């Protein structure tokens, strides 16, 4: 087991609230919208689509409304039900429990209406609705030009393959046809989030994983002296959650930025790390030798990217304790009140982030 220095009582941890980290971003948005108003330009409009009268979804929608109002974004909630039919908590619970055979079609109609509405700039759908393939289907019919959550397959593919910049004309194109080939000759220290070349824009990332990245940037985990795209080099991070919504995308984002990431789930632990060079990448990782066609495809695809994407491999550690003890950053996302990361596992000066609705760390 890795030997690390344990936290000492004379060096208590420091608690940082996400609200303080978010404030500069909120101010920036508010200022930009203020400029648009001065120029008599339209204010961005976001539509939130609610499928069911479930308390968590309604609470999230109401929070979205307050957040938008605070910075000057126009926000509307589109519901599938008429409020006059749900007047109290008992009826709300009964309505939620009934099987609505029209629900998928109703949600789809609202999404299509928002897609067509030229006054709508962004669309947000409150999931889960059905779970599984039905929700995935609904995510794919949202116009990618209006998808503020980055759930469309186009954005998912870009995120996992480390494609950071796109041309608006590429939106909706098939995977493998959207690349950064025109940027390959540019210095990676010049092409970054603040210096996007003309004609390109940032690909949309899912909100919670991106929020975790912003938290890590704010506390100095990212090293700005290193080249953009490799500023987590030398850092070891444990992410305790591998959901398709947050945990897996987060592990991919962090490893694409150079970190060694231990991804811990309920029944397995895997390691996300930066993709190796072509020679190592083409080496067999199973009992089969890669075909010449696969090797050629790897080489062709690599040449079309500005930087490599991550790979997933077996983790050298077989238990979460060993992963946490070896980590500079520990990120908890377990939706269980009984799950706690023991303080004794966390090494001195490690950063801990909790994105679960429950407290995942001992206090």
Protein language model annotation of sequence segments:
Residues 51-69, 172-341, 351:
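Glycine-rich phosphate/diphosphate-binding loop of Rossmann-like nucleotide-binding domains
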Residues 116, 322-324, 345:
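Structural alpha-helical scaffold elements that stabilize or flank donor/cofactor-binding regions
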Residues 150, 332-334, 338, 344-363:
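ADP-ribose/adenylate-binding Rossmann-like module
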